């Protein structure tokens, strides 16, 4: 069981997607939510300083949270000012943070300052081993990867893509592949990105571009019929993977699962 925490209304919309699955316990925090067993009303203020002065005590609310916690935070949102204070209250947990980065070119004023501050501090948390991992999604890159995305369904499709990506990574961690082995990332490599893979040519569409990736893990899903009948498929895939950039500082691993 993994506990999912959404900090703020936007992040909680993503967290709500996990209700469709059985292996998660969901905690929603935002000004749109009423106090209940799994939701907490966060007060909204006009300036960031007020958030820092009014960090809620969530120890009772989160007392039954699992040891493995995945926290969703939306960059530039005023509610992200609560994030550091909330993370401090669950610091004994194994915390994975998923950060949704907005289009910073169009940010101005206070939202831009908030985004810069929270994004920078969370990276330092990851580098200091206070977080198990810090995974970044870019709204810009997600939009590029999605077809039929309109203004009306923009955020729902973005949220669905984030949910699907995280859920399947969680699934792969606990399900044995048909063949191959995903290497465990080194402790030092805590800042991550996720992307979509076209297995026809092994081309990637990253949902955030890391500057210097040190490890790349390929999770390959193939239907049962192809796995059973297509001879030479494994060699074909492995040969393409061997053409990927790799050296002593950049490792590549893979696994193949049945869909």
Located regions from the model:
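Tubulin/FtsZ superfamily GTPase core signature
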Residues: 1-259
